[in-house]
Curated annotation (Swiss-Prot):
Signal peptide region: 1-25
Protein name: Protein UL141
Pfam families: UL141
UniProt organism field: Human cytomegalovirus (strain Merlin) (HHV-5)
Known outcome of mutating R8Q: In strain: Isolate 1M
UniProt-annotated location(s): Host endoplasmic reticulum membrane
Transmembrane segments: 279-299
Amino acid sequence: MCRRESLRTLPWLFWVLLSCPRLLEYSSSSFPFATADIAEKMWAENYETTSPAPVLVAEGEQVTIPCTVMTHSWPMVSIRARFCRSHDGSDELILDAVKGHRLMNGLQYRLPYATWNFSQLHLGQIFSLTFNVSTDTAGMYECVLRNYSHGLIMQRFVILTQLETLSRPDEPCCTPALGRYSLGDQIWSPTPWRLRNHDCGMYRGFQRNYFYIGRADAEDCWKPACPDEEPDRCWTVIQRYRLPGDCYRSQPHPPKFLPVTPAPPADIDTGMSPWATRGIAAFLGFWSIFTVCFLCYLCYLQCCGHWCPTPGRGRRGGEGYRRLPTYDSYPGVKKMKR
């Protein structure tokens, strides 16, 4: 009976062994073991130069977070999001860097209809996140190479739907000048001609003005709600970029006025290029050094001609030469051969 029972259980054991890789794959995709908490965060050397300036877009507009990385040895890649109007921690979409399948999607609650894509290239990888932006989903999105405890942040994309400025009550409302491209240090928008603003009350004696990009279907009727008075989480990044137009942006503390420092003296305009000026200076320096050396050589010749004695000078004639040897008899042939 024992042998028969063991024979009956062999097919079941064989089936379990064959299905183990599938179970492991299913468990890794459905119940991920990776977490969104990164113990050690590092930034790439070209992190600031490759990160574009913050962009101001309209609510409901579709945006894509493109992440492009070169060939690496990290086991996972991710898109890490920190939302401007949320006090919670960061959420993260984690993908396997080898196969490209999803390990964890912490953005599914904030972005339920978002789609992601992963492409493996010969020299690198491209992974992206596409969603419709809103006030709740505006924030900072970072491209990260990571493992279970460490992460290397490669790029940062800042998506904004509203931009807060302050103006004095007795001054007209300022209009910020938005850029047209993502390069540089100026906040930009792909549609700056649709810029609108609305009043959101007072803040520390200043008039709160919120600028937004109007919708194409209802630019004059629709207005977003005024946010809280507290500065958002994106302010630490936004304040690094320029916003021309004589506008005061909100700050967590009153601004500190620095003393005026004297301006450096202006350069004298010679009408010549700097390379021509350097060439003339080098030419004059060379000839000045050559002239000094030549004068020193002439002085040496003149001084030595009068003060330095030469061989044979100042002696009686003939005493300066060696006398020829004298022989009593001419040497024979045998002596010559020696």
